Protein backbone atom coordinates (compact mmCIF):
# COMPACT_ATOMS: atom_id res chain seq x y z
CA UNK A 1 0.00 0.00 0.00
CA UNK A 2 1.42 3.46 -0.90
CA UNK A 3 2.68 5.60 1.96
CA UNK A 4 0.91 8.80 2.95
CA UNK A 5 3.47 11.53 3.64
CA UNK A 6 2.59 14.72 5.51
CA UNK A 7 5.12 17.39 4.49
CA UNK A 8 5.52 20.56 6.57
CA UNK A 9 6.85 23.73 4.93
CA UNK A 10 6.34 27.15 6.50
CA UNK A 11 8.62 28.59 3.81
CA UNK A 12 8.29 28.13 0.06
CA UNK A 13 10.61 25.24 -0.67
CA UNK A 14 10.82 21.47 -1.11
CA UNK A 15 9.53 21.14 -4.69
CA UNK A 16 11.89 18.35 -5.72
CA UNK A 17 11.16 16.34 -2.59
CA UNK A 18 7.42 16.68 -3.18
CA UNK A 19 7.84 15.58 -6.79
CA UNK A 20 10.00 12.63 -5.77
CA UNK A 21 7.35 11.50 -3.29
CA UNK A 22 4.82 11.58 -6.10
CA UNK A 23 7.15 9.62 -8.41
CA UNK A 24 7.54 7.03 -5.64
CA UNK A 25 3.77 6.57 -5.58
CA UNK A 26 3.13 8.28 -2.24
CA UNK A 27 0.02 10.17 -1.27
CA UNK A 28 1.38 13.66 -0.55
CA UNK A 29 -0.18 16.09 1.93
CA UNK A 30 1.28 19.56 2.49
CA UNK A 31 0.92 21.55 5.71
CA UNK A 32 2.00 25.13 5.07
CA UNK A 33 1.28 28.71 6.09
CA UNK A 34 -1.92 30.44 5.14
CA UNK A 35 0.07 33.23 3.48
CA UNK A 36 1.58 30.66 1.08
CA UNK A 37 -1.82 29.42 -0.09
CA UNK A 38 -1.43 30.98 -3.55
CA UNK A 39 2.28 30.22 -4.00
CA UNK A 40 3.54 28.33 -7.02
CA UNK A 41 3.67 24.89 -5.42
CA UNK A 42 4.09 21.79 -7.64
CA UNK A 43 0.37 21.17 -7.30
CA UNK A 44 0.38 18.16 -9.61
CA UNK A 45 2.50 16.40 -6.96
CA UNK A 46 0.34 17.30 -3.94
CA UNK A 47 -2.93 15.57 -3.11
CA UNK A 48 -4.17 17.98 -0.44
CA UNK A 49 -3.20 21.25 1.24
CA UNK A 50 -3.69 22.23 4.88
CA UNK A 51 -2.93 25.66 6.31
CA UNK A 52 -1.75 27.10 9.62
CA UNK A 53 -0.82 30.56 10.90
CA UNK A 54 2.74 31.23 12.02
CA UNK A 55 1.49 32.25 15.47
CA UNK A 56 -0.78 29.21 15.90
CA UNK A 57 -0.29 27.57 19.33
CA UNK A 58 1.37 24.15 19.35
CA UNK A 59 -1.69 22.64 20.97
CA UNK A 60 -3.91 23.78 18.11
CA UNK A 61 -1.51 22.27 15.57
CA UNK A 62 -1.63 18.96 17.46
CA UNK A 63 -5.42 19.00 17.49
CA UNK A 64 -5.56 19.82 13.78
CA UNK A 65 -3.15 17.02 12.89
CA UNK A 66 -5.08 14.55 15.05
CA UNK A 67 -8.31 15.56 13.31
CA UNK A 68 -6.62 15.03 9.93
CA UNK A 69 -5.43 11.59 11.07
CA UNK A 70 -9.05 10.50 11.56
CA UNK A 71 -9.39 10.30 7.78
CA UNK A 72 -5.76 10.05 6.62
CA UNK A 73 -3.34 7.30 7.63
CA UNK A 74 -0.17 9.34 8.23
CA UNK A 75 2.78 7.02 7.56
CA UNK A 76 5.53 9.65 7.60
CA UNK A 77 5.88 13.29 8.65
CA UNK A 78 8.63 15.27 6.92
CA UNK A 79 9.97 18.78 7.66
CA UNK A 80 11.03 20.60 4.49
CA UNK A 81 12.77 23.46 6.31
CA UNK A 82 14.94 24.02 9.40
CA UNK A 83 12.12 25.91 11.09
CA UNK A 84 9.77 22.94 10.72
CA UNK A 85 11.98 20.28 12.34
CA UNK A 86 10.55 20.82 15.82
CA UNK A 87 6.94 20.83 14.66
CA UNK A 88 7.46 17.61 12.71
CA UNK A 89 9.17 15.93 15.69
CA UNK A 90 6.37 17.02 18.02
CA UNK A 91 3.68 15.64 15.70
CA UNK A 92 5.53 12.32 15.23
CA UNK A 93 5.59 11.76 18.98
CA UNK A 94 2.02 12.88 19.51
CA UNK A 95 0.60 10.78 16.64
CA UNK A 96 3.09 7.91 17.15
CA UNK A 97 4.44 8.16 13.60
CA UNK A 98 7.89 6.63 12.85
CA UNK A 99 10.86 8.99 12.82
CA UNK A 100 12.81 11.11 15.26
CA UNK A 101 10.94 12.66 18.16
CA UNK A 102 11.48 15.88 20.06
CA UNK A 103 14.53 14.83 22.08
CA UNK A 104 16.43 13.67 18.98
CA UNK A 105 15.14 16.62 16.96
CA UNK A 106 16.66 19.08 19.42
CA UNK A 107 20.12 17.81 18.52
CA UNK A 108 19.53 19.21 15.03
CA UNK A 109 17.91 22.54 15.98
CA UNK A 110 18.79 23.44 19.57
CA UNK A 111 22.26 25.03 19.71
CA UNK A 112 22.61 24.09 23.39
CA UNK A 113 21.74 20.46 22.70
CA UNK A 114 24.12 20.42 19.73
CA UNK A 115 27.03 21.69 21.81
CA UNK A 116 26.29 19.39 24.73
CA UNK A 117 26.13 16.39 22.39
CA UNK A 118 29.36 17.42 20.62
CA UNK A 119 31.26 17.95 23.87
CA UNK A 120 30.13 14.61 25.30
CA UNK A 121 31.36 12.93 22.10
CA UNK A 122 34.79 14.55 22.41
CA UNK A 123 34.31 16.92 19.46
CA UNK A 124 36.11 20.27 20.01
CA UNK A 125 33.75 23.24 20.36
CA UNK A 126 33.92 26.74 21.86
CA UNK A 127 33.34 26.93 25.61
CA UNK A 128 29.68 27.63 26.36
CA UNK A 129 27.12 28.00 29.12
CA UNK A 130 23.33 27.86 29.20
CA UNK A 131 21.78 31.22 30.04
CA UNK A 132 19.91 29.77 33.00
CA UNK A 133 21.64 29.74 36.39
CA UNK A 134 23.12 33.17 37.13
CA UNK A 135 25.87 31.84 39.41
CA UNK A 136 27.00 29.46 36.66
CA UNK A 137 27.02 32.33 34.16
CA UNK A 138 29.12 34.49 36.51
CA UNK A 139 31.61 31.65 37.01
CA UNK A 140 31.81 31.13 33.24
CA UNK A 141 32.35 34.81 32.40
CA UNK A 142 35.09 35.05 35.05
CA UNK A 143 37.23 32.43 33.32
CA UNK A 144 36.36 32.59 29.59
CA UNK A 145 38.08 35.26 27.52
CA UNK A 146 35.95 37.88 25.77
CA UNK A 147 34.33 38.57 23.39
CA UNK A 148 31.36 36.23 23.79
CA UNK A 149 28.45 35.41 21.52
CA UNK A 150 24.85 35.21 22.75
CA UNK A 151 22.77 32.94 20.52
CA UNK A 152 19.10 31.95 20.44
CA UNK A 153 18.94 28.19 20.88
CA UNK A 154 16.46 27.52 18.08
CA UNK A 155 16.95 30.12 15.36
CA UNK A 156 18.68 29.41 12.04
CA UNK A 157 21.92 30.84 10.64
CA UNK A 158 22.89 34.14 12.34
CA UNK A 159 19.38 35.27 13.29
CA UNK A 160 19.32 36.96 16.71
CA UNK A 161 23.05 36.50 17.44
CA UNK A 162 24.78 39.22 19.49
CA UNK A 163 28.49 39.76 20.08
CA UNK A 164 29.24 40.86 23.65
CA UNK A 165 32.40 42.57 24.96
CA UNK A 166 31.83 42.89 28.72
CA UNK A 167 30.01 41.33 31.65
CA UNK A 168 28.01 44.51 32.26
CA UNK A 169 26.82 44.50 28.65
CA UNK A 170 25.87 40.84 28.99
CA UNK A 171 23.79 41.33 32.13
CA UNK A 172 21.98 44.31 30.62
CA UNK A 173 20.95 42.14 27.66
CA UNK A 174 19.97 39.21 29.89
CA UNK A 175 17.74 41.55 31.91
CA UNK A 176 15.87 42.57 28.74
CA UNK A 177 15.24 38.90 27.87
CA UNK A 178 13.11 38.34 30.97
CA UNK A 179 11.55 34.88 31.02
CA UNK A 180 13.10 34.10 27.61
CA UNK A 181 16.63 33.92 29.10
CA UNK A 182 16.66 30.13 29.06
CA UNK A 183 16.10 30.20 25.29
CA UNK A 184 19.72 31.35 24.83
CA UNK A 185 23.22 29.92 24.98
CA UNK A 186 26.38 31.96 25.59
CA UNK A 187 29.64 30.86 24.01
CA UNK A 188 33.19 32.07 23.47
CA UNK A 189 33.73 33.96 20.22
CA UNK A 190 36.39 32.31 18.05
CA UNK A 191 37.08 34.19 14.79
CA UNK A 192 37.61 32.16 11.64
CA UNK A 193 35.89 30.51 8.72
CA UNK A 194 32.72 28.51 9.34
CA UNK A 195 32.08 25.28 7.46
CA UNK A 196 29.21 22.85 7.66
CA UNK A 197 28.48 19.47 6.14
CA UNK A 198 25.01 18.45 4.97
CA UNK A 199 24.58 14.69 4.86
CA UNK A 200 22.06 11.91 4.41
CA UNK A 201 22.37 8.75 6.50
CA UNK A 202 20.61 5.51 5.63
CA UNK A 203 20.94 2.40 7.80
CA UNK A 204 23.72 4.12 9.77
CA UNK A 205 25.74 4.73 6.60
CA UNK A 206 26.47 8.14 5.07
CA UNK A 207 25.09 7.97 1.53
CA UNK A 208 25.54 11.66 0.64
CA UNK A 209 27.62 14.54 2.02
CA UNK A 210 28.58 18.00 0.80
CA UNK A 211 30.72 20.58 2.62
CA UNK A 212 30.00 24.32 2.41
CA UNK A 213 31.57 27.49 3.78
CA UNK A 214 29.49 30.30 5.28
CA UNK A 215 29.27 33.35 3.05
CA UNK A 216 29.35 35.69 6.08
CA UNK A 217 32.57 35.82 8.10
CA UNK A 218 32.27 35.12 11.82
CA UNK A 219 34.55 38.10 12.26
CA UNK A 220 31.49 40.27 11.66
CA UNK A 221 29.30 41.67 14.42
CA UNK A 222 26.57 39.07 13.94
CA UNK A 223 28.62 36.08 12.76
Segments (PLM) and residue ranges:
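Generic structural signal for residues in well-ordered beta-strands
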Residues: 49, 128, 184-186
Amino acid sequence: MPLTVLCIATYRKGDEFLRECRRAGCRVLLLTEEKLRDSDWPRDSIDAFYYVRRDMPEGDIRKGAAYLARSERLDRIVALDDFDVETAAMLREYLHVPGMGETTGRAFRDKLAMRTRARSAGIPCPDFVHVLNHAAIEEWTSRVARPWVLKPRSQAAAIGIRKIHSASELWEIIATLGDAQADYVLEQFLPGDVYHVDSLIFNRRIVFAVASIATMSVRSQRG
